[in-house]
From Swiss-Prot:
The flexible SMC hinge domain, which separates the large intramolecular coiled coil regions, allows the heterotypic interaction with the corresponding domain of SMC3, forming a V-shaped heterodimer. The two heads of the heterodimer are then connected by different ends of the cleavable RAD21 protein, forming a ring structure. Pfam families: SMC_hinge, SMC_N. It comes from Xenopus laevis. Keywords: ATP-binding, Cell cycle, Cell division, Centromere, Chromosome, Coiled coil, DNA damage, DNA repair, Mitosis, Nucleotide-binding, Nucleus. It comes from the Eukaryota. This is Structural maintenance of chromosomes protein 1A. GO terms for cellular component: kinetochore; meiotic cohesin complex; nucleus. Involved in chromosome cohesion during cell cycle and in DNA repair. Central component of cohesin complex. The cohesin complex is required for the cohesion of sister chromatids after DNA replication. The cohesin complex apparently forms a large proteinaceous ring within which sister chromatids can be trapped. At anaphase, the complex is cleaved and dissociates from chromatin, allowing sister chromatids to segregate. Its main location: nucleus.
Amino acid sequence: MGFLKLIEIENFKSYKGRQIIGPFHRFTAIIGPNGSGKSNLMDAISFVLGEKTSNLRVKTLRDLIHGAPVGKPAANRAFVSMVYSEDSGEEKVFSRVIVGGSSEYKINNKVVQLSEYSDSLEKLGILIKARNFLVFQGAVESIAMKNPKERTALFEEISRSGELAQEYDKRKKEMVKAEEDTQFNYHRKKNIAAERKEAKQEKEEAERYQRLKDEVARAQIQLQLFKLYHNESEIEKLNKELSVKNKGIEKDKKHMDKVEEELKDKKKELGKMMREQQAIEKEIKEKDAELNQKLPQYIKAKENPSHKIKKFRAAKKSLQNAQKQYKKRKADMDELEKEMLSVEKARQEFEERMEEESQSQGRDLTLEENQVKKYHRLKEEASKRAATLAQELEKFNRDQKADQDRLDLEERKKVETEAKIKQKLRELEENQKRIEKLEEYIATSKQSLEEQKNLEETLTEEVEMAKRRIDEINSELNQVMEQLGDARIDRQESSRQQRKAEIMESIKRLYPGSVYGRLIDLCQPTQKKYQIAVTKVLGKNMDAIIVDSEKTGRDCIQYIKEQRGEPETFLPLDYLEVKPTDERLRELKGAKLVIDVIRYEPPHIKKALQYACGNALVCDNVEDARRIAFGGHQRHKTVALDGTLFQKSGVISGGASDLKAKARRWDEKAVDKLKEKKERLTEELKEQMKAKRKEAELRQVQSQAHGLQMRLKYSQSDLEQTKTRHLAMNMQEKSKLESELANFSPRINDIKRIIQSRDREMKDLKEKMNQVEDEVFEEFCREIGVRNIREFEEEKVKRQNEIAKKRLEFENQKTRLGIQLDYEKNQLKEDQGKVQTWEQSVKKDDNEIEKLKKEEQRHMKIIDETMAQLQDLKNQHLAKKSEVNDKNHLMEDIRKKLGSANKEVTHLQKEVTAIETKLEQKRSDRHNLLQACKMSDIKLPLSKGTMDDISQEEGSSQGEESASSSQRSSTVYAKEALIEIDYSDLSEDLKDAVADDDIKQEMSALHQKINEQQSILQRISAPNMKAMEKLESVRDKFQETSDEFEAARKRAKKAKQAFEQTKKERFDRFNACFESVATNIDEIYKALSRNSSAQAFLGPENPEEPYLDGINYNCVAPGKRFRPMDNLSGGEKTVAALALLFAIHSYKPSPFFVLDEIDAALDNTNIGKVANYIKEQSMSNFQAIVISLKEEFYTKAESLIGVYPEQGDCVISKVLTFDLTKYPDANPNPND
């Protein structure tokens, strides 16, 4: 196998000038410090082997010239040449030159194209695109971290199967689309064939159906003309009769108008009174709410002063104690100041006396000059003789002074300890007083808390009783409301019904005489058995409110809106348009008019009842109701006793489950009693709600009790702490100080005994010294006339000592008194601060109590005023209520007069109503006939007007129409009256039928003929009338689809062949590479690991087309169990990645392998294994050129190429070579 012999570089990256690098051995290591240009050498090898510029860490080719990145290129060209030695010994030189901004390729100094250059390298086994000759820095770690899909991409790159990926995807899409088109055209062809067969059958059925349909249309026209002809004849007859009757009614109506005018005036007066009464009621409610709102405020204002007074008393007592303590301490301080003045005065007197004595004695003890000299000479001689004694005495004096200082210190400590004991006694006294105050406050708080608890229990009991009673009342009210209202009305509905009843009473009071009440309250079925049927017919009108006029209705609606009430239905008597009752219906057997089984009062609400009931009939059973509704030539609205309702339109509605509950409302006596019970319960509920409102007061009391409880808790805690901690601590400290004080006396006595003992010894020494002095001063003493020299000296020295001692006593007294005075001053200042604090607290509490009392009085005044105003309003309400009752009695008399007049008019109107009802029914019948013709598309022959003039509105029963619907019906009937029908096509035999029996017989015959023809049509399912056109269209589409299917089938076959060819080529490329790598990887991994137990596996996730999914790579490290790749250690992962790298290289291997720092992630153990493996492989399989920084690795190489930097404008790389074959390896066997 050939190998890379030399590399020649000129001005490439960090290599300035021309440099020859090599020769390269079978295993060469490139070493050098970081930044020296090692990787640039690898870039040079990559460059000469045709690598892209983007992979050489630069943007353009010019940047590869030395110095170009810093703007100082060393030349305008650069090149790299590679000398390759083949097995035969022949050498080939490959060069790549940078000229300007492009590359120039040469083989043996001959310029060639890139393709030829690449082909020559491929013949040597160097694949530029696959880069099978080099491994960049960090590639090992990258391979170790790859997931299965990324490994697949790596194999696609190595095997060059990825070059076919785009063509593969393109041809696969073309194949799938072609197959889908083929399938689509096949199903389309199949469906159109079925359509063609179906279209033939439809054409035959359509022709037969049209013939029958024409015959039915002609028969229907005859039937409708027959009905309309006789309907118009009857309408003309009834119009003449109605005109005669109406003239007789006008006269009687004038009398009624006069009585109604009188009633209207009285209504206005009553309305004014009712509004005044309602205004007073509103004010009473407002005042009651205001009182309930202000009562808790008054209770709170009443409670606040009592708590503040307790606090004030406690503060006042604390002030008195503080003042008492301040006065006592002030007296103690005054005593100390007096004592200080007394000591100062005694000191001054002593100083004056000493001055006088000094002057008198000074004259007596004056010596002559020669005597003084003699005294000093003799004194010096005496000192020399008694020197030993003097030294001993001096020692005693020093010891005596030290003990005296100790004595003074102990006595000072004793005085300080006594002062501290006094301070602790005062603190004990203060703590004792604090305990007394806390105990007093706790007792008071407990008493207050007990009172609050009692009040809370009382209020809680009242509120709970009120709540229980409210629940009981609500439960009873619910039962009452369920009986009064619908069975569907739930617990919330009862309050809604109550609200509606209140509004009803209000509008009755506001508009007396104009608002009659709800329809259900003004009428009653004649027998109980009719209750369900009447309830069903009245329906939603059952709760409608009847008023005298439209204006009253609108005023009531406005009032309900203002009161935020629920929507209500109003029936104004002057606005309703009612169809006359059809008198013929009273003659039907087995049925009665619903209006005939209802009693109503007052009489003038009949119009509203006619509007609600219409011409509805009530029957004993469902069969009769159905027969009468649909059995005759004319339909009727009927209802059975069980509530089953049959509409004219054909709609049937059964008796709902709640109908019986609604029907119970007719029980008048039960309703009255229930209403009375409801009113009584409502009043009681109001009273209990007042008691329940005390919840606010209860919460206030609970809050105050909680606050008191917390303060009591803190006070008890403070008391406990004061007793167990502060008091005990003070007692302990006092005991400790007393113990210390007791120890002072023995110590002081011991020191005094030592001092006294030493005094005796010092006296003895002094006497000895005196004897020596007496011997020396004997003659001198006789001369000056003293017994001994000490008399002379004591006169002067003793006096000075006594004076100094006395002065020291004075100073000690002043110091002691000053310390005590300063302490007392500080304590006095603290006591004065306490007095001021408590004085401020007392003053503040006093002011707050005054404010709270004023606030309590203000709230009490407001409550009294509010209660007085409330009582005054109640008195006004009683007076106004009495006036309203009187006015109501007067109006009742007028209503009776009006009722009598109305009965007379009603009697006269019955005949007119009967005629109007018949006439209206005939008009409705004509409208229904015309409408039926229009809806059924029956073309009537018309001499005036068109079919478009016929209204689409359905003629309904009176009970179902609203006022606006009645107006629209009249307009429709008037418009349709202008339509003239041409009866020339109607046979004369049908026109001549006059008697009812003849008309019924002819009509029955026409109906039977039509029914027979329609029966035949119904048995024939409606055909497609455009069947012929459909058949022609389907034939054309079938031929077109057949052609498209054949073309799509050919395209699919061609696309599949092309795809299979690309798929096979891609699979062959990929599989050849994969099988090679999979076969070699286990052996390579064992060799790298130096252990035959190591195992490595490669497996595709998709064996059929492995390049579409991932490739799994797993290794079993030596001496370990199988684990996923992610769970291997860092070193194990790196070795596994190298095994994969070398296995990939084994597929179409290049003659040399350049590796950049593959040992970076290896530990010392694995470095040796990898280095030995590369050394083995380099002997037989490939030449290895490795960049390395680790000694353990590059020492295994046959030669070293050292790269070192020199500094210039930019780094300049220099190269050294070193042949290691001359130096035997310490461990030459790579298997060890």
